[in-house]
Amino acid sequence: MRKSVIAGNWKMHMTCAEAKSYLEEFIPLIKNIKDDRKVVIAPPFTAISTFSNHSDFDYLDISSQNIHWEDQGAFTAEISPKMLLEHGVSYAIVGHSEPRKYFSESDEQINKRAVFAQSSGLTPIVCVGETLEQRERGEADRIITRQVEQGLENTDPSNLIVAYEPIWAIGTGKTCEAEDANKICSLIRKLIGFDDVIIQYGGSVKPNNIDEIMSMSDIDGVLVGGASLDPNSFARIANYK
């Protein structure tokens, strides 16, 4: 049985002091979480040490928000697996729509990040998703297929999470219908060809829709943005029914 992964992406939010305060409130709310799931938070790089130094660290895992495909070198503003592992990081988000959009990340670059993450001992959370225009033109399946085939080439599906995040649903308040999201997640699973690969949904996930999302057969977790910034909201999501 696939284990659910409930992940929060804080993006460029939370100072170290704010992260510490958040954890003090959040940790007690997930201490009795069911053992069929795990909780992951991707804080800003500056706040990662706040997590790794927290006494209740066993209750959740840490993810980075990106990763480079080299361990060191002249790569300004990048961060390497070696640096992250030193702070107890277990996961790395790659291919999120924001770096794809703002920094023109290609599927080839995303693939290099994912492959190097795995070879370094991290589990990549590889994001895929279509724009509203692509969806309205009936191109969603083709776009997702390309992103999966190119972005996941030579990766190990047993140490991989794929997050389906329709770009038009991220931070907009618009949520992809659960059945529609499940169809795309089913497509991703078939493309990968490994039934046990963990597939998440992301895009305006909130306490009021988490139960329906997680009732879908091919959705194994969620990648949460804004709702993960509030400890009570994210705890409700993590403790879905």
Swiss-Prot record:
Signal peptide range in chain numbering: none
Keywords annotated in UniProt: Cytoplasm, Gluconeogenesis, Glycolysis, Isomerase
CDD domains: TIM
Pathway listed: Carbohydrate biosynthesis; gluconeogenesis; Carbohydrate degradation; glycolysis; D-glyceraldehyde 3-phosphate from glycerone phosphate: step 1/1
Pfam families xref list: TIM
E.C. number(s) listed in UniProt: 5.3.1.1
Gene3D superfamilies in alphabetical order: Aldolase class I (3.20.20.70)
Any GO BP: glycolytic process
Keyword Cytoplasm carried by entry: yes
Top EC category: isomerase
HAMAP family xrefs: TIM_B (MF_00147_B)
Name this protein carries in UniProt: Triosephosphate isomerase
